[in-house]
Every structure is written in structure tokens, then in C-alpha cells.
Curated annotation (Swiss-Prot):
Protein name: PWWP domain-containing protein 6
Span of the signal peptide: none
Gene Ontology terms: biological process: regulation of DNA-templated transcription
Annotated family: Belongs to the PDP family.
Entry-linked InterPro entries: PDP_family_Arabidopsis, PWWP_dom
Source organism: Arabidopsis thaliana (Mouse-ear cress)
Bias (Basic and acidic residues) ranges: 329-348
């Protein structure tokens, strides 16, 4: 073996080589000595590129590539993604095979596989073909998951911001927990995103103008382009729509149960006819009817031959069948295609519950009916006659079969009819335009003409003018009638409002006096008015400050508002102060006398209550007879405590 030179020539190590060859090699070395470093770099890069090309040709796929692989159970092409073997879970390592790639299939994340590169096919190149191979919900959901994952890579490629988009975590039994989904090669994503390199907005505009999408992948790529465009503009993301997904394995059962309910309720399944000529369907129904009638006749003959006695009703029914058998068959054979269609529809209608009820009621129709008119002549009427509908088939009898509910509905219907009759007899009836000798449209045209043209009486004849005048007078008398009850109620309401206003006017006001400690001042008059306005209306003219702003008077219009302000001020001072503040409420002369009388009455009652308490304590002491027990001590403590509480609560 020889040493490899930068030019690619090989030097032999044998001692018996010719001197001429050595000289030639030395000449070559001298010619390229100056550019040896540059050539060496080119050779190294070429070797590395050859190594990469060799690996790509040998393998054909990289980690992160989307592929189609055959599922082991169904032998069907399934979407998946290649992962690094270092990320394989313990379950996947048990079935690991040398020289094969780890593929995690999309879907519910329950299956994976170690696949030979020859068993895989690229995802994008075969998407249109393989995505339409099955219509099962499980396969379609797997394809949607794969397309959604590709869309995330597309948006990440367009946004170029790692902080904005976070890579998702792989969820598969063959992959370790917490492993991030590998990135796809930029060459694949760029070929998918950009038809014309560097043009994104024009691509979106073109798709918006054509509004044509070849497959699901194209829709996802467009959606991700628009989302990336909004992200670059600093706007919100696109709205996400999640389709309603059924539980795998239960969607067919749910569909069958719904269909079963439809069949039970409305005879849905029996109404599905076979596609074909109407004549063929009619012939099959005729054949079935003939066979059923012949079988009935044969069974009746066998019963007669065996000596079984038949009732009169059965004999009549058999006789009717024998007489009408031939005629009925001939008439059915002579009927046209439309009659066959009607018969098939009748048979289908009998499948419904309402038709079965009608079948129980004997409402058969004969083809020919004899009727007598008033003169006694018999009239032969051919064709279908009108059936007399039973009242028991009306909705009020069909919906609720309870006797009580039926009586209630009948009574409500009768009462509604009575109300309608009473309403029709009242004077508020509609205007009869026919009596005026014109239709509503003509009257409307005449009224419009009279409203638009001031010279209406000159343009039209006297009859039309009279009609308009009569209609307007009727309309005014019809529309301007007042309800006497409403007119009578109006003065009462007005009187109540006036009484309330007088009460508020006659209600005496009250004055709140505020006094602060020595050496301190109160807030200004405006500040006090703003503070106490929240309790009610104030009389600003009667409100004033005195004693060098150490005292003030706030006049309230209503006594109730003043009392509320007084009580709130006693609880907590409504303005900031550093000294003690006293509040006093004074009523006017008339109100003060009433207030004083009430206070005196209250004081008298409180004194009487104290006397009763003292008498009770004295009675306990008299009953003790000079001996004090524990029970007596407890009673005296309770009574004295109650007495002291009453004394503390007394207002001086």
C-alpha cells in the first residue's frame, strides 16, 4: 500500500521501482506545492460530502422524517415519524433489531416498529395516494395528526422564533417519556412551503383567489402561513377548531342504535325501496298478494275436508274472497304504472304506527259505490270515495289516552270557542270593507291618492270620495275607543302621586349640630355639605358655620336622612379630625314637640319596666326568709344584671 497524496496520486514503497517514475512524481509534487493547502481543504470537504451522500444513499431517511410504513396487524400503509434509537423506551429496546429504524406511528400512540429503510416510503411524495387508501376513522385521525405535526414544523420554520413556539412532546409507547419531537430537515419544509423561494404573501393571495385545495396537507400549510403572518405582525393567533371525535370502536354501535330507534318510531327501514322500474315493483307486490290469497283458499278447503265447522262470519269472508278473487286480479293486471306506485306507497305507509291503527278500524274502500240522491235515483260512483275520519284519530285522542286529560282538552277547546264568540259580538269588530263597495287594495289606493293629492275631490268622482270619508270615520271610531277602566284608574294614580309629593313637602326637616374640641376647627362649609350630601338632600341656605369654625349646623330636608346621618356619625366620624367631636340632632318646633312627647312616653315605659324589675327582686328577697341559697344567689345576679343593662341603655 502507498501513501495518499493531496493530488490523489499513490507512491509505491517497493525498492525495485523505476527512477523515471520517481522523477515524474517529484515534478508533480513541485508543481502543486504552492497550492497544497487549498487543495487539501477541497479534498477534505469532498470526502465529507461523499461520506454524507453515501450515508443518505445507504439509509435514505433521517431522524425526524415523516414516512409511510406498513402496520404489522393490518398490512396497511400508516403515517409515522422516524426517531433516534437512543430515545427508544424499554419496551421498544426489547424488540430492537440492528440496522433498522425506529418509527413511531401516529394515532392513539399505542404502536411503533423497527423498520428496514426499504420498507418505508416518503410521506410527502406519497401523501395523495396513501391518504385515500382507507375510510376508517382510526386511519383518518392518524393522518390528521401527522398533517398537524407537519403544520407545526411549517409555522416554526416561518416564524423563526424559538421562544414563540414550543416543541411538543412525543406520546408513544415506543418513545421515552419527555422526549421532544425531532425537527424536520429544512430542505423538506422549504420545498413544502415555498413554491417560489422567498415569496409567501403572493402564495397566500393566490390561494385566496383560487380557493381550491387539492388535499388536507395544502389546507394545513395555508393555515400555518396565515398564522405565521399574524405572528410576525404582532397580532393574535388564528382561532382553533377541534372537531367532535368519537370514541374509537363505539361510533358504529352508536349509529346502529340511532337507526334502530328510527325504525321503531317511524318505520324508517321499510320505506327504503329498491332502485328499478316501477312495473317490476308492482309485479312483485301482485305476485305476493296472489300467493297469500291462494294460500288462504287452500287452508279453508282443507278445514272443510277435515270436517271442521266454520262460523258464519268466516263463511262470509271466504265467500267474499271467492267472488272477488278473479275480478280483483284482472283489475290489478289492467292497472297502469301509477297505480302500482300507489299500491307500493300504501304498503309502505302501513308500516307506521298510525297506519296500523287505521288498519284495525275497518275503513276499506270499494271501487264502485251506489248512492241515492234526494229524488230517489241511484247514482253509480266509480273511483275512491271520501273516508269518514274517526274522531279518535284526531290529535287530542292520539297524544294522550287518559280520560282526564281528554276531558280537560275538550273543555279548553269549548271555552276558547266561547271566548271567540264573545269577542266577535263585542263592538271592537273589524271594519268590513266589502260593505263600502270596494276591495282592501282599492281602499288603500284611494287613501294614498287622497293623502298625496290635495285636489283629490276634484280628480275623483263623488262615490270614491264618499267611500274614503266613510272608511276614515269608521276607522277613527274603531280606533279611538277608550277603556273606561283605564280612564277611571288614571285619576287614582295621579292622586297617589300628588299625596306622596305633599307628604315629602310637609315632612319637617332636621338640623345636625357638630362641635369640635377647644383649639381645633372643623372642615369648611362646602366640605361638610359634600360629606353629608350622600345621606340625603340638604338645605344649603340654613347650613352655616359659627364660633370661629369650631361649630357648624347642617340642615337636612328630610328628618329620616338627618337621623341616619346622626347615627352614622356617632358610629364613625365621616371626616378626618384630631380632636373629639360631638354631634347633636335638633328638630324644629312642631317636630320637636312631637319628638319630645314620644320620648316622654318612652321614658315613662322604661321607668315602669325598672319598677317591675325592682319589685321582682324584692319578691325574691321576701321569699328567702333571711336565708341565701345558691339558687337564690344566681337568680339575684341575673335580675340585677338585667336591671343594670336597662339603666345603661336609657337615653337622658
Amino acid at each position: 500500500m502507498g501513501n495518499i497524496l493531496p493530488t490523489g496520486s499513490r507512491v509505491s514503497e517497493n525498492e525495485g521501482s523505476d527512477d523515471n517514475k520517481l522523477k515524474e512524481h517529484d515534478v508533480k509534487m513541485e508543481n502543486v506545492k504552492e497550492d497544497s493547502e487549498q487543495i487539501g481543504d477541497n479534498v477534505r470537504s469532498g470526502v465529507s460530502s461523499l461520506r454524507d451522500n453515501f450515508e443518505e444513499l445507504e439509509n435514505g431517511f433521517h431522524v425526524g422524517d415523516f414516512v409511510w410504513g406498513e402496520e404489522a396487524n393490518s398490512q396497511q400503509w400508516w403515517p409515522g415519524q422516524i426517531y433516534d434509537s437512543l430515545d427508544a423506551s424499554d419496551l421498544a429496546l426489547k424488540t430492537m433489531q440492528k440496522g433498522k429504524l425506529l418509527v413511531a406511528y401516529f394515532g392513539d400512540g399505542s404502536f411503533f416498529g423497527w423498520c428496514n429503510p426499504l420498507e418505508l416510503k416518503p410521506f410527502l411524495e406519497n401523501f395523495k395516494e396513501f391518504s385515500k387508501m382507507s375510510d376508517s376513522r382510526r386511519f383518518l385521525l392518524a393522518v390528521e395528526d401527522a398533517v398537524r405535526e407537519i403544520g407545526e414544523h411549517v409555522e416554526k420554520f416561518l416564524v423563526c422564533d424559538d421562544a414563540a413556539l414550543v416543541s411538543s412532546v412525543a406520546l408513544n409507547l415506543g418513545i421515552k417519556d419527555g422526549v421532544v419531537v425531532p425537527d424536520v430537515r429544512r430542505k423538506i419544509i422549504s420545498s413544502l412551503v415555498l413554491e417560489n423561494p422567498g415569496v409567501v404573501l403572493e402564495d397566500v393571495k393566490r390561494l385566496a383567489m383560487t380557493v381550491r385545495f387539492d388535499d388536507l396537507l395544502e389546507i394545513e400549510v395555508l393555515r400555518r402561513k396565515i398564522s405565521a403572518f399574524y405572528r410576525c405582525k404582532g397580532r393574535f393567533d388564528l382561532a382553533k377548531f377541534d372537531e367532535h371525535r368519537y370514541i374509537i370502536g363505539l361510533e358504529d354501535k352508536e349509529h346502529e342504535s340511532c337507526q334502530r330507534l328510527l325504525r321503531k318510531c317511524s318505520g324508517f327501514a321499510s320505506k327504503k325501496r329498491k332502485c328499478g322500474d316501477v312495473a317490476t315493483t308492482g309485479s312483485t307486490t301482485l305476485r305476493k298478494k296472489r300467493l297469500s290469497e291462494v294460500s288462504k283458499i287452500e287452508t279453508a278447503e282443507k278445514e272443510i275436508s277435515n270436517g271442521k265447522s266454520l262460523s258464519s262470519r268466516k263463511r262470509k269472508s271466504k265467500r267474499g274472497l271467492d267472488e272477488n278473487d278473479d275480478d280483483g286480479i284482472e283489475k290489478r293486471e289492467e292497472s297502469n304504472d301509477s297505480n302500482h306506485l300507489e299500491e307500493s306507497e300504501k304498503k309502505d305507509d302501513l308500516a307506521t304506527p298510525l297506519a296500523s291503527i287505521c288498519k284495525r278500524l275497518n275503513v276499506d274502500v270499494s271501487s264502485c259505490v251506489k248512492r241515492c240522491n234526494g229524488n230517489g235515483e241511484a247514482i253509480l260512483q266509480t273511483g275512491k270515495r271520501e273516508r269518514k275520519k274517526s274522531k279518535y284519530l284526531s290529535p287530542e285522542y292520539m297524544t294522550d289516552f287518559s280520560c282526564r286529560a281528554r276531558k280537560i282538552k275538550i273543555e279548553s277547546a269549548e271555552s276558547s270557542q266561547i271566548q271567540v264568540a264573545v269577542r266577535m259580538t263585542t263592538p271592537n269588530t273589524a271594519i268590513d270593507v266589502v260593505k263600502l263597495g270596494a276591495t282592501p287594495e282599492e281602499m288603500l289606493a284611494l287613501i294614498r291618492a287622497a293623502a298625496l293629492n290635495a285636489q283629490y275631490p276634484k280628480d275623483y268622482n263623488s262615490t270614491s270620495c264618499d267611500m274614503v270619508r266613510e272608511f276614515v270615520s269608521n276607522y277613527r271610531s274603531f280606533n279611538n275607543k277608550r277603556n273606561l277602566s283605564d280612564v277611571e284608574k288614571q285619576p287614582e294614580v295621579k292622586q297617589e302621586i300628588v299625596d306622596e309629593k305633599e307628604k315629602t313637602r310637609n315632612e319637617p326637616g332636621v338640623e345636625l349640630y357638630i362641635k369640635t374640641g377647644f383649639g381645633s376647627t372643623l372642615p369648611s362649609k362646602d366640605d361638610l355639605i359634600k360629606t353629608y350630601e350622600k345621606f340625603g338632600a340638604l338645605d344649603k341656605e340654613r347650613s352655616y358655620m359659627f364660633n370661629n369654625n369650631s361649630c357648624s349646623c347642617v340642615a337636612f330636608v328630610n328628618a329620616s336622612d338627618g337621623e341616619e346621618a346622626f347615627n352614622r356619625s356617632l358610629e364613625k366620624c365621616p371626616f378626618a379630625t384630631t380632636s373629639t367631636v360631638t354631634f347633636k340632632l335638633e328638630y324644629p318646633s312642631s317636630a320637636s314637640s312631637e319628638k319630645k312627647e314620644a320620648e316622654t312616653r318612652k321614658g315613662v315605659t322604661e321607668i315602669e319596666c325598672l319598677k317591675e324589675k325592682l319589685e321582682g327582686i324584692r319578691a325574691l328577697l321576701d321569699q328567702s326568709e333571711g336565708k341565701i341559697t345558691e339558687e337564690l344567689k344566681m337568680k339575684l345576679e341575673d335580675e340585677s344584671r338585667n336591671l343594670l343593662d336597662k339603666v345603661r341603655k336609657m337615653i337622658i
